[in-house]
């Protein structure tokens, strides 16, 4: 299969499309025997094969020979820009050493903060590059990257700048999120309110003015920040024109999802302890529920998110890797899909929607990403599969034939 020139229009024939567009009604939004017309980095048309006049087309023509095509994957929740490793800490925990002892010895999130602060922007981007490339190799074309391991003005900005540097060097779209309210740094031990002052009065305004973040996140949890502190962060985000999202209801129910919904948040993430009021709030606000099965698995949790209630209420469910060094060190979007099915009870179709249409919605990109539809960006994946369910069924099997970003393709073979 040839690789199209990135600046020329292209016509992709003989495709089986998993459009993930509910307008088509069929499972996966499937269209058999169709063609895609790509121009200027966007999908210009999705048309039946019989209407695709290859002979008269003024660009490049490619025969997909009946292969399945999906939208490019969207990984809507990652912490992939960081320094260091927590493998030794994980090994200790497996042998029975309590987390409190590890933290007292300088481990835990503080060790990642220390390692991240030690690296400069270029070094941080280089350290994170293999993780991003691993996601791209499985079909990720858009990825969210959070800060949250700097916890000072300079280091939070450095993380966001490193994420932007990665976007500039690779064919991938990066959505940056400020997560300064991730943990209380050592300098503010015992003074969470004082640290929140720093976030809302300094870190967040500077990041907003610099254009380094498009959204603001906060870890609303008993071991993170209280609902009142989270509200302060969200109010500051709104004042600076930034969208909000939240790490909520992961370990307990502090009604953080309702707070996210109150601010019209893009997404409520983790949500293992989400209750009926939280489900209703997400539905009313149009907020996406982001499921993170990797962290659930890695931490050996037992409380599952209320998938049946979310499904019944019609709350869109996204699926993401939560790639991070402490609780989900997995750079595999297809593993997350498999885990969402096996651990949380999603169907393969729901899992695929979770890394395409709904994940795009969780990043405020629902109108332009995550579907094969006219007007959407020309980010698409060509697969060697017999059925779309295979994408969530197997892990580690290289199924991706071609990754197309804004109309330009790369061979995966």
From Swiss-Prot:
User: How many cofactor units bind, and how?
Assistant: Binds 1 zinc or iron ion per subunit.
Sorted keywords for this record are:
Cytoplasm, Histidine metabolism, Hydrolase, Iron, Metal-binding, Zinc
**One Pfam match, by short name?**
Amidohydro_1
Q: For this protein, what is any one GO molecular function term?
A: iron ion binding
The UniProt annotation places N-formimidoyl-L-glutamate binding at 149, 324, 326
The pathway to which it is assigned is: Amino-acid degradation; L-histidine degradation into L-glutamate; N-formimidoyl-L-glutamate from L-histidine: step 3/3
Enzyme Commission numbers on file? 3.5.2.7
Which residues does Zn(2+) bind? 77, 79, 247, 322
Query: Where is the protein localized?
Result: Cytoplasm
Instruction: Establish whether keyword tRNA-binding is in the entry.
Output: no
The reactions it catalyses are: 4-imidazolone-5-propanoate + H2O = N-formimidoyl-L-glutamate
Cofactor requirements of the protein: Zn(2+); Fe(3+)
Q: Where does 4-imidazolone-5-propanoate bind?
A: 86, 149, 182, 250, 327
Per the record, the similarity remark reads: Belongs to the metallo-dependent hydrolases superfamily. HutI family.
Q: What is this protein called?
A: Imidazolonepropionase
* Source organism of the structure: Chromobacterium violaceum (strain ATCC 12472 / DSM 30191 / JCM 1249 / CCUG 213 / NBRC 12614 / NCIMB 9131 / NCTC 9757 / MK)
Encoding gene (name): hutI
């Amino acid at each position: 299969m040839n690789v199209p020139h990135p600046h020329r229009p292209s016509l992709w024939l003989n495709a089986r499309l998993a459009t993930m567009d509910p307008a088509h009604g069929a499972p996966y939004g499937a269209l058999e025997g169709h063609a895609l017309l790509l121009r200027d980095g966007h999908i210009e048309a999705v048309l039946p094969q019989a209407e695709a006049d290859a002979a008269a087309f003024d660009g490049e023509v490619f025969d997909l020979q009946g292969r399945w095509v999906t939208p490019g994957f969207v990984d809507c929740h990652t912490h992939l820009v960081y320094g260091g490793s927590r493998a030794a800490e994980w090994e200790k925990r497996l042998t029975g050493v309590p987390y409190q002892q590890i933290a007292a010895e300088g481990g835990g999130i503080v060790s990642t903060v220390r390692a991240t602060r030690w690296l400069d922007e270029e070094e941080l981007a280089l350290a994170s590059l293999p993780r991003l490339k691993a996601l791209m190799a499985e079909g990720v074309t858009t990825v969210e990257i959070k800060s949250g391991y700097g916890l000072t003005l300079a280091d939070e900005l450095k993380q966001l700048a490193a994420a932007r540097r990665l976007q500039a060097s690779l064919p991938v779209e990066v959505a940056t999120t400020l997560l300064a309210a991730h943990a209380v740094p050592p300098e503010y031990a015992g003074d969470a309110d004082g640290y929140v002052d720093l976030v809302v009065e300094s870190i967040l305004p500077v990041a907003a003015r610099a254009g380094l973040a498009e959204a603001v996140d906060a870890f609303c949890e008993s071991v993170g920040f209280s609902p009142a502190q989270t509200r302060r962060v969200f109010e500051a985000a709104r004042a600076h024109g930034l969208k909000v999202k939240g790490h909520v209801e992961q370990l307990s129910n502090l009604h953080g999802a309702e707070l996210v919904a109150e601010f019209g948040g893009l997404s409520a993430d983790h949500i293992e302890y989400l209750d009926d009021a939280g489900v209703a709030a997400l539905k009313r606000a149009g907020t996406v529920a982001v499921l993170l099965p990797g962290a659930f698995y890695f931490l050996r949790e037992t409380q599952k998110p209320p998938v049946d209630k979310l499904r019944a209420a019609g709350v869109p469910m996204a699926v993401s890797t939560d790639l991070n060094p402490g609780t989900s060190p997995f750079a595999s979007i297809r593993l997350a899909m498999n885990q969402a099915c096996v651990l949380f009870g999603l169907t393969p179709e729901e899992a695929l929607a979770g890394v395409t249409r709904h994940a795009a919605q969780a990043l405020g990109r629902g109108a332009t990403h995550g579907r094969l539809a006219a007007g959407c960006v020309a980010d698409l994946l060509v697969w060697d599969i017999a059925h779309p369910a295979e994408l969530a069924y197997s892990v580690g099997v290289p199924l991706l034939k071609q990754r197309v970003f804004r109309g330009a393709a790369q061979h995966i073979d």
